[in-house]
Regions:
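Conserved acetyl-CoA pyrophosphate-binding loop and the N-cap/start of the following alpha-helix
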Residues: 86, 90-98
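Conserved GNAT acetyl-CoA-binding A-motif
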Residues: 96, 103-115
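Conserved beta-strand in the GNAT
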Residues: 46, 52-61, 76, 81
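Active-site rim helix/loop that mediates acceptor-substrate recognition in acyltransferases
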Residues: 25-48, 58
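Helix-loop element at the rim of GNAT/NAT acetyltransferase active sites that forms part
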Residues: 14-28, 65
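A short beta-loop-alpha structural element at the N-terminal edge
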Residues: 1-13
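Conserved active-site alpha-helix within GNAT-family acetyltransferase domains
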Residues: 93, 105, 117-136
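Conserved acetyl-CoA binding element of GNAT-fold acetyltransferases
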Residues: 71-84, 138-139
Length: 144
């Protein structure tokens, strides 16, 4: 079952997200997600198997320019994760479908996402979910 996540699910979301975004901590993610949930332009979904959380997705509405799109707002997949041992069961596809339905309900005509250039698993997932590649970029920074 896929369902919308609520404030009571913040601990579950933060723990799942920390498995994907290992550069962050559960506490930081809990705080960030708590702040994000107060905004109406973002939604989290949880995937449950036998009432056990096994995955999540985070989607948003983007009003700024999104690479390769032509409309505003654009639904955007900010993150998607399914625990090892529960993968290849179609759960990520279910989570994505929930995000797409949410975005469509919010008036979006396009849905977009991104992934790190070396994340082959994510690239393959996006291709399998009928995303088309719109661009590749390299980001730069320097200290001032």
């Amino acid at each position: 079952m896929v369902r919308k996540a609520e404030k009571d699910d913040l601990d579950i979301l933060a723990n799942l997200a920390a498995l994907m975004w290992s550069h962050s901590t559960v506490n930081i993610l809990f705080y960030e997600f708590s702040e994000m949930m107060t905004k109406g332009n973002l939604q989290f979904f949880l995937k449950l198997e036998n009432n056990t959380p096994v995955g999540f997705a985070q989607c948003s509405l983007r009003y700024d320019y999104v690479e390769g799109t032509e409309t505003i707002p654009v639904g955007y997949l900010e993150g998607i994760f399914v625990k090892e041992g529960f993968r290849n069961k179609g759960y990520a596809k279910e989570l994505l479908a929930a995000c797409e339905a949410w975005a469509k309900d919010k008036g979006c005509r396009e849905f977009a996402s991104d992934c790190e250039i070396d994340n082959i698993d994510s690239f393959c997932f996006h291709k399998a979910m009928n995303f088309t590649e719109s661009n590749r970029i390299i980001c730069f920074k320097k200290m001032l």
